[in-house]
């Protein structure tokens, strides 16, 4: 039996009046169950000439999470931002060291420790995507451009784990979705 708060129903009635409604779904996260109401809203993009476009160019890196620069169509750089989530990376590397210590003592899989590592990694990618979008909105960018990253066959040597944990495609999908 599912009950809804009055505020939730009021919010849906006020904010989702003119949006296309889909079938509600019941999702489980951990031990909690959530009722999700999906809606679709049509957004129309502005038609801007190529000469008047403002571009947000994003370079996803291993050391800095992202390097963003705002450029005009003639090539002049208007703004620049380095997204480096240092504390989150420190938490991630500390969690990886916990996994390493646990696996040194025996051939254990450590699923809870790996889940913590993966959750930290998705959190880093979400925060990076949010920083990129906020920077693009700040300068009213018309287009967000990512570099083409192909890492197949290049995972060897010292930075192999760092490259394996790099979530470049997830960041691109999150930015595209938002």
Which stretches of residues belong to each language-model region?
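Charged, flexible boundary elements
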Residues: 1-53
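Positively charged, helix-rich recognition surfaces that bind polyanionic ligands
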Residues: 31-178
């Amino acid at each position: 039996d599912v009950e809804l708060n009055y505020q939730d129903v009021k919010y849906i009635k006020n904010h989702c009046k003119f949006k296309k409604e889909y079938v509600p779904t019941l999702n489980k996260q951990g031990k909690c169950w959530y009722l999700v109401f999906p809606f679709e809203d049509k957004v129309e993009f502005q038609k801007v000439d190529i000469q008047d476009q403002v571009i947000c160019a994003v370079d996803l890196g291993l050391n800095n999470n992202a390097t963003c620069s705002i450029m005009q169509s003639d090539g002049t750089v208007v703004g620049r931002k380095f997204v480096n989530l240092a504390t989150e990376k420190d938490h991630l590397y500390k969690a990886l060291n916990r996994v390493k210590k646990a696996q040194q003592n025996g051939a254990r899989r450590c699923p809870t420790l790996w889940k913590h590592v993966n959750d930290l990694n998705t959190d880093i990618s979400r925060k990076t995507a949010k920083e990129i979008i906020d920077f693009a909105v700040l300068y009213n960018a018309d287009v967000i451009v990512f570099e083409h990253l192909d890492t197949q066959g290049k995972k060897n040597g010292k930075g192999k784990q760092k490259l394996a944990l790099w979530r470049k495609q997830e960041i691109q999908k999150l930015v595209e979705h938002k």
